[in-house]
Design a protein with these regions (language model features):
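A mobile "lid/hinge" subdomain adjacent to the ATP/sugar-phosphate binding pocket shared
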Residues: 186-263, 296
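N-terminal phosphate-binding loop and adjacent alpha-helix
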Residues: 35-65, 230-233, 237
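Glycine-rich phosphate-binding loop and adjoining helix at the ATP-binding site
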Residues: 43-56, 68-69, 76-136, 273-286
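Glycine-rich phosphate-binding/hydrolytic loop that grips phosphoryl groups
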Residues: 30, 113-124, 270-324
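Glycine-rich phosphate-binding loop plus the immediately following alpha-helix
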Residues: 25, 105-108, 112-116, 170-205
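Short glycine-rich, Thr/Ser-proximal phosphate-binding strand/loop in the N-terminal lobe
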Residues: 2-53, 83-86, 160
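Phosphate/pyrophosphate-binding loops at sites that engage ATP/ADP/AMP, CoA/4′-phosphopantetheine
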Residues: 53-69, 108-110, 128, 208, ...
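Glycine-rich phosphate-binding loop of actin/hexokinase-like ATP-binding domains
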Residues: 132-189
């Protein structure tokens, strides 16, 4: 577990934010102003006991009284009980469990929500969407996540599944998604999808500057973007096709929710203008007639710690120390 420290004034309320990801778990003490007091990270737990032990190791580092624990986790979360109702993939061991029971929060209030929603909370409270009341956040990484704020309220839906934008159907005959559907956005634009599509190009012996690693590992999405920027035709072909699906999905989302701003986050956002320019071009040409305005598109402001900050933000919102 690796800590990082910054300063926070002694009169600030402080909460613990925990972000449970597929490959890493992060935690931080966060002040009500959004200041990161101290942060921790390690590879993701693979058992309930490992999750419990990590959180309690963090709690023992507290230097001040804590207002509570906020949890951001993939999957569908019952916010009233902290139950993980659906969670396929590497964190499946949490499915059906109450996070409050797994973590045993030592008398502290515990609040939980989907990790894309906690990322959205951090942007609305302290980041690129500060002060906005209608926001869509799209996270692009190994998978595709999403969260939506409408008139100051986070959309959760009847079963807590609202905002799972990565599971919009874009291709009725597309590949099978982990959700059981076919042709989801996540199967067309995600690190998994881009790297798999690039592998198919390698198997067809298409001209390319990249190759498989010594152990047969795929070129990373970052490397594919870099190769495309340097003129690699295979990389450019893969990304052009993936971006067609992404821009189509973005245009649909903007027509449905009519946000003040669209926030793009996740590891793929590091591609910068290669990602943002085609999205902005598509939005400018395909939404202006109906929406009558240009919708700002911005990258996530709290890069690297939005998940833990937003998880702590759950505590501050629930205890009415902050409001959206």
């Amino acid at each position: 577990m690796s800590p990082d420290r910054t300063n926070v004034t002694s009169d600030q309320a402080v909460a613990v934010g925990v972000d449970i990801g597929a490959t890493a778990i992060k935690a931080a003490f966060v002040g009500v102003s959004g200041t990161l007091v101290e942060s921790f990270h390690q590879p993701s737990p693979r058992t309930p006991a490992a999750l419990h032990d990590f959180v309690h190791l963090v709690l023992r580092q507290a230097k001040t009284q804590l207002r509570g624990i906020g949890i951001g986790c993939k999957g569908i979360i019952d916010t009233a009980t902290s139950r993980v109702t659906s969670l396929p993939g590497d964190l499946h061991f949490l499915e059906g469990r109450l996070l409050a029971d797994v973590i045993d929060p030592a008398g502290l209030p515990l609040y939980a929500d989907n990790d894309a929603r906690t990322a959205l909370i951090s942007e609305v409270l302290w980041g690129a969407a500060r002060g906005k009341r209608n926001v869509v956040l799209l996270t692009l990484g190994t998978g595709v996540g999403g969260a939506v704020l409408v008139d100051g309220a986070i959309l959760r839906g009847a079963s807590g599944a609202a905002g799972h934008l990565g599971h919009m159907t874009l291709d009725l005959n597309g590949g099978l998604c982990i959700c059981g559907n076919r042709g989801c956005l996540e199967t067309r634009f995600s690190s998994r999808a881009i790297e798999s599509d690039y592998l198919a190009h390698l198997h067809r012996a298409a001209p390319t500057k990249l190759s498989l690693g010594k152990a047969g590992e795929l070129p990373s999405t970052e490397a594919i973007f870099h190769a495309a920027a340097e003129g690699d035709e295979s990389a450019r072909c893969v990304l052009d096709r993936a971006l067609e699906y992404l821009t189509g999905a973005v245009v649909s989302v903007l027509h449905i929710f009519d946000p003040e701003v669209l926030i793009i986050g996740g590891n793929i956002a590091e591609a910068g203008a290669q990602l943002l320019t085609p999205i902005r071009d598509a939005v400018a040409h395909r939404t202006r007639i109906l929406l009558g305005r240009e919708i700002p598109i911005a990258f996530q402001g709290l890069v690297g710690y939005g998940g833990v900050a937003g998880a702590a933000g759950l505590v501050f919102l629930q205890q009415r120390l902050l409001k959206i």
